[in-house]
Design a protein with these regions (language model features):
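Compositionally biased linear targeting/interaction segments
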Residues: 27-314, 318-322, 329, 338-342
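Outer membrane beta-barrel
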Residues: 296, 302, 312-399, 531-554
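Exposed, low-structure sequence patches enriched in small/polar residues
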Residues: 280-287, 376-378, 427-460, 464-469, ...
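A subset of solvent-exposed loop/turn segments in beta-rich extracellular surface proteins, enriched
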Residues: 235-267, 345, 349-372, 396-428, ...
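Outer-membrane beta-barrel proteins
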Residues: 307-319, 369-372, 422-427, 516-522
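Bacterial N-terminal signal peptides that target proteins for export
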Residues: 3-13
């Protein structure tokens, strides 16, 4: 009933404001006199576009559409502009001219826009952003592209790609990209996503003998006094553990380890390891991460790339480089150095350090790698070819990996942590395998875009993997690391995986899937179905990952990572507090689930932008979980949009005797407005989590949190813009998350922050982004020993305990410079 009441109130507010604001904004709709000459809509400034005999709001929409989507290739494309009707179009059609300036002039702008895609709930991964940037520099010739080539493009489905190829076959060739509008089953959304990355002739691609792209990024962020998980917090946790390892006290960690069979030498080794980690964190206190990246391209045949990243606290820099050769008669790509491989649904192989929950789409194939991925990077040689209907991909890599070492020198687990300290490069690993894809397109009655593949890879470690709770968990304490996701990890120095994947497309329906079996262990599979129309789509995904299936390179669709909701989240239950970083391993948890997703444009001004239901089971404990989320957008007039999002989640958490249940609700209202060329947004969220009654919670069964966020962007010109944002929050006992600029920020306690970002395209080939942010967080500590102002007796000494508030202030700034020539 509470949820229903909240939804009714929110809907009432939306429609009340939506009814009043059209009148308030009516002043923008002014009319100008007819023009004696035509305006080139592709080169005109905002002020020149406003001289058209249309409303100011519609003129701004015409201009904004060009900035966001690229140059108009036909006068009829202005019909796509929100608010443009056929009558207005006929009135201004004769007043508009369409020129065809070089697309490369807009590359710097689109690269900046791509960076902002990272600030989204289901954002693309860094590797995908890199590939799309490369396609902006070297567009895809749609007249020579195959289905798999088109699927590299952002937001393009298998149905879209097949429809584009079929339409090209029907026409013989595509003269203008706008001709793809008429492709059957290609949605307007799919076409818009393609448009900035494709051309129709080789003459339109950048065929200069040599082109280069250099990027420098500097991140100055104080990780010492940050939020939970800050370096100062970690140092305190390490100091507390070191105190417990002193041998002159009773009933401490030293005693427990001795009773568990640890020798004094082994305990001393653990102590020295913790000291080394603490000192590395202190060194990393000085902020300042620097990244330098350089990419060369000789026509479309040779690509070279190199990147050096220096992180505070790490003695060794992350160095990546590759050389890629393309365009051979039977060899599509040959890569030497660092590279990425993605096969099928990512169940067998997708080497990235990034985790993305509910990822329904990924780009497949072989790519050079200059991303931040370190632990799961590949270093060696790989090739992708084409021989008739056979499309082979093979790879070999030898690289050093980070991990937790047992006392006997074996590897307990992979780990991602920063700084790497004692975990860095402790063993080496060889990975080799590949995919043999068989293209069945147009064979007999088999539809275009159909393939089946045989996939395999093998891992050889220099030190065997041997998971052992006695090497990670504090012995004899209350909480035990007894989760089967950990206990059923395989042992040994060699692992072999065999699998198959497939895809087929029929009209507006696509089916995809992948199955992988780990030799002498478990298996996993993913199935995906898509049905799409112009205003509506439905995705269904089924996944199953067995308890005894462990694949460190698996990044298939999942809701939780492997060690999420386990004891490793509690650093005080571990022999080394930094072992808590195990929860960041991006490997899917053993789960079985069903996922449904849809988008539906109900009317021109009313759209369900995205809604999904995920029902999954934690196979380690047979616990069922549900997550439901939906977002509704209402646009009463073009410059104004409201978005109301609601999330419900019921999650069961394993406990020693009986599982507990948390029930989460989040309501978010966002308002967007485009006023006189400025972009304004306002967001408010309220969240609450209801817990299962437990004496440990002292009656605190309800956690609540909220925040208010506002952002504004002003375009001073086509090249210079400034973005400003501010937020205040009271997260209570829960955590909140918020998107800003090009990333995500987690909110704890109470606080406020503001940021300013300057984006400037200094020339057609030089762009700059500078951001400064100030964040202040307060952590109230109340009722530590019951009511305030009570005496606590430690060592028979009375100490008055008072409530207090911990305040942390952070100042960070980031600079990114892109230069192309």
């Amino acid at each position: 009933m509470e949820i229903l009441a909240m939804r009714k109130v929110a809907c009432s507010i939306i429609f009340l404001i939506g009814s009043a604001l059209p009148l308030a904004l009516h002043a923008q709709f002014t009319h100008s006199s007819p023009l004696p000459e035509r305006i080139d809509i592709n080169t005109a400034s905002r002020e020149e576009v406003r001289e058209l005999p249309i409303s100011t709001a519609l003129a701004d929409a015409l201009y904004a559409h060009r900035i966001a989507k690229g140059y108009y290739r036909s006068v009829y494309e202005i019909l796509e502009v929100p608010g443009m009707d056929k009558r207005t179009f006929e009135e201004i059609k004769g007043l508009i001219a369409i020129s065809h300036p070089e697309e490369r002039r807009e590359v710097s702008k689109y690269i900046l826009l791509l960076q902002e895609r990272l600030a989204a709930e289901e954002s693309p991964r860094e590797g995908a952003i890199d590939e799309w940037e490369d396609l902006l520099l070297s567009p895809l010739n749609i007249n020579r592209a195959g289905v798999d080539d088109i699927l590299l493009l952002e937001g393009v489905t298998a149905v879209d790609a097949v429809s584009a190829v079929k339409h090209r076959r029907f026409l013989g060739s595509i003269r203008y990209t706008s001709a793809l509008r008429d492709a059957k089953y290609l949605t307007p959304y799919g076409f818009r996503n393609m448009r900035n990355y494709i051309v129709t002739t080789d003459d339109e691609t950048d065929e200069r003998s040599l082109s280069m792209h250099y990027r420098m990024r500097y991140d100055h962020e104080d990780l010492w006094l940050g939020d939970e998980g800050s370096y100062s917090y970690r140092v305190d946790a390490l100091n507390a553990e070191l105190e417990e390892l002193e041998s002159d006290t009773v009933d401490n960690l030293y005693t427990s380890l001795t009773n568990a069979g640890w020798t004094p030498e082994q305990i001393y080794g653990l102590k020295q390891k913790l000291i080394n980690e603490r000192e590395a964190l202190k060194v990393a206190r000085t902020p300042g991460a620097v990244s330098n990246r350089l990419r060369f391209r000789y026509k479309n045949h040779v690509k070279l790339g190199a990147r050096i990243v220096s992180q505070p606290g790490d003695d060794d820099e992350l160095i990546k480089q590759y050389a890629m050769f393309t365009g051979g008669p039977f060899l599509d790509k040959l890569v030497i150095g660092n590279y990425r491989v993605t096969i099928g649904q990512g169940l067998l192989f997708d080497n990235t350090d990034e985790e993305r929950a509910r990822l329904t789409q990924r780009i497949e194939g072989l790519f050079g790698d200059l991303t931040d991925t370190d632990e799961f990077k590949l270093s060696g040689i790989a090739a992708e070819g084409r021989l008739a209907i056979l499309h082979p991909l093979v790879f070999y890599s030898r690289d050093r990996k980070d991990g937790i070492l047992n006392r006997d020198g074996t590897v307990n687990s992979y780990i991602l942590t920063q700084p790497r300290a004692a975990f860095g490069d402790v063993f080496s690993q060889e990975d080799y395998g590949g995919e043999l894809r068989i293209d069945l397109s147009d064979m007999l009655i088999i539809p275009l875009g159909t393939y089946v593949s045989l996939n395999a890879y093998e891992t050889q470690m220099s030190k065997p993997l041997r998971p052992d709770t006695a090497e990670v968990d504090i012995p004899f304490d209350k909480d035990r690391l007894d989760d089967l996701n950990y206990l059923m990890m395989p042992s040994g120095d060699k692992r072999t995986y065999l699998g198959t994947s497939f895809r087929t497309v029929y009209r507006n329906v696509s089916l995809e899937g992948e199955y992988v079996s780990q030799q002498e262990h478990g298996y996993g599979y993913v199935l995906k179905a898509l049905v799409q129309f112009n205003t509506f789509y439905v995705i269904y995904m089924k996944r199953h990952y067995g308890l005894d299936f462990f694949n460190p390179y698996s990044r298939a669709f999942s809701e939780q990572s492997k060690f999420d909701d386990t004891v490793v989240e509690k650093d005080y239950r571990l022999l080394d507090p930094l072992y808590a970083d195990l929860q960041d391993l991006p490997i899917p948890k053993a789960e079985d689930g069903h996922y449904f997703e849809t988008r539906y444009q109900i009317a021109q001004n009313l759209t369900i932008t995205k809604a999904y239901v995920d029902v999954w089971r934690n196979l380690a404990y047979d616990l069922d979980n549900v997550r439901i989320q939906g977002e509704l957008e209402y646009r009463p007039v073009f410059p104004l949009r409201f978005r109301l999002k609601q999330k419900w989640q019921v999650k069961q958490l394993p406990k020693a005797i009986l599982a507990t249940t948390s029930r989460t609700q989040e309501t978010t209202l966002r308002v967007f407005a485009l006023v006189a060329g400025d972009y304004l947004s306002l967001e408010v969220r309220y969240g609450r989590v209801r817990l299962t009654p437990n004496e440990l919670y002292n009656g605190n069964l309800l956690m609540e949190g909220n925040y208010l966020d506002a952002a504004w962007e002003h375009n001073f010109s086509d090249f210079l813009s400034v973005v400003g944002g501010a937020a205040v929050w009271d997260a209570g006992s829960m955590s909140q998350w918020i998107f800003e600029d090009v990333g995500i920020d987690f909110l704890y306690g109470e606080g406020k922050k503001y940021y300013v970002t300057v984006k400037d395209r200094l020339s057609e080939n030089i762009s700059l982004r500078f951001k400064v942010r100030r964040k202040s967080t307060s952590y109230p500590h109340t009722g530590i020993y019951g009511s305030s102002n009570e005496y606590h007796y430690g060592d028979d000494v009375p100490v008055l305990v008072r409530d207090f508030t911990d305040v942390r202030d952070q100042l960070s700034y980031n600079l990114q410079i892109d230069v192309r020539w």
